[in-house]
Amino acid sequence: SFTEMIDEHFPDDETLMAADGAELEVLNDTLRIMALMFDYLGDWNEIARFYDEHGTRYFEYRIYAELSNQYYEKKYYKSSASTLRAFVDRFPDDDRAPLYYRRLISGYEKAGYPMLRRKHKEIFIERFGVGSPYWETHGEEVRTLITVALGDYIWDLATFAHGWGQQTKSARDKRERLEQAAGWYREYIRSFPKAPDAV
């Protein structure tokens, strides 16, 4: 099977990352075919189903990424995002989880889904933000990866709510939106107390 082939030739992530030339070509072809097969069997959920039965593999992250890319190329944007979300849900403590979630948000941004983009920015902040269980259990390298996106996401949500609050005619909507904006500004200051724009 394809799984056994990767097991044999790429026993760990180091050997997988070091693949080049013809070896890399074979690896990429194998991952592409595996992603197609899982899609044929149903969708992204088939990856977890298969490896729950046959044993978890360190390289599952590559299959999720490949399947997500295939969906995106076909303009199945929500399926692409769901595949990345499935990886994060399956491996919530993985060092790659924030990176995959950032890809999900970026995909919605490029595809023109502003509401979904904002919704998932909120989820990202809640899931990976400063002080979250994920944040507390990961080191500086992973935190840096999170921080790169975190400031942009919080600021975007704050300015969106602020702008909407200023434009709306309804007093109730105005109050709600401005309260939301204030909440996001507070979150920004809490997360980045030393930032020059936090005062």
Located regions from the model:
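Acidic, polar-rich low-complexity tracts and alpha-helical solenoid repeat scaffolds
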Residues: 1-199
